[in-house]
Amino acid sequence: MARSDAFVILPVKAFVGAKSRLAPLLSVGERTMLARVMLNDVLDAAIAAVGPQSVSVVTSADDVADHARRAGVGVIDDEGARGTNAAVKVGFARIAARRRGAVLTLSSDIPGLIPSDIVALISAAERSRVALAPACDDGGTNALACDVVGRIPLCFGPGSFARHIAAANAADVRPAVLLNQRLGLDLDEPHHLMQFLDRGTSTQTDAYLRVLRLKERKGHSFVVAAQQATGARRLAV
């Protein structure tokens, strides 16, 4: 399945302090480990899709850089970038300086994705110039693939999917959109963890969350709220 003609980058912040919105449910140590195992799962999928030589993590965090090197992928210094847009822009510029072709940027908190999802995004970008995968909940963008040179303006953040569509249209591009639950579920909120566990994936993230026994933390109002939110989303589907 591996493709050597495309490149994947992942902007990643320091593990320590990651996933603050999960603080009501997980300790600092648990969130730190969760960030690590999620990155492992996303890197595994990317490596299987394009090969380790075509995957890089964009970061200025030493712990993340060391982790990426141990995984066998490249590291791009984000040059102190503030925010995802700035980090991805640095990554794209570094890739454009040494190669041409499609480049895909992925969130590091979508551990349910599989290699064929990445290949599908890259192939769609080659046909349509831009391919996007929206987040399920907040209207964000969990994946964006485009030509590394002819890319559209970056608009990551809540509500960014609509902004990316508008930016593509302004550039006279009709982007491909992949409505994919694996790509769409980023683990940001407590109820996302419950949704992810309900899918029963063969991932490091699934194994780690099951060790934590989240559903057995009875009496914790946030677990109850998370379970209720998951049920509500099922009814809405």
UniProtKB/Swiss-Prot annotation:
Protein name: 3-phospho-D-glycerate guanylyltransferase
Purpose: Guanylyltransferase that catalyzes the activation of (2R)-3-phosphoglycerate (3PG) as 3-[(R)-glyceryl]-diphospho-5'-guanosine, via the condensation of 3PG with GTP. It is involved in the biosynthesis of a derivative of the hydride carrier cofactor coenzyme F420, 3PG-F420.
Family: Belongs to the CofC family.
GO BP annotation list: F420-0 metabolic process
Enzymatic reactions: (2R)-3-phosphoglycerate + GTP + H(+) = 3-[(R)-glyceryl]-diphospho-5'-guanosine + diphosphate
Recorded superkingdom: Bacteria
Pathway named in the protein's UniProt entry: Cofactor biosynthesis; coenzyme F420 biosynthesis
Entry GO MF terms: GTP binding; phospholactate guanylyltransferase activity
Source organism phylogeny: Bacteria, Pseudomonadati, Pseudomonadota, Alphaproteobacteria, Hyphomicrobiales
UniProt keyword annotations, A-Z: GTP-binding, Nucleotide-binding, Nucleotidyltransferase, Transferase
InterPro entries: CofC, Nucleotide-diphossugar_trans
Listed EC numbers: 2.7.7.106
One Pfam assignment: CofC
Enzyme class: transferase
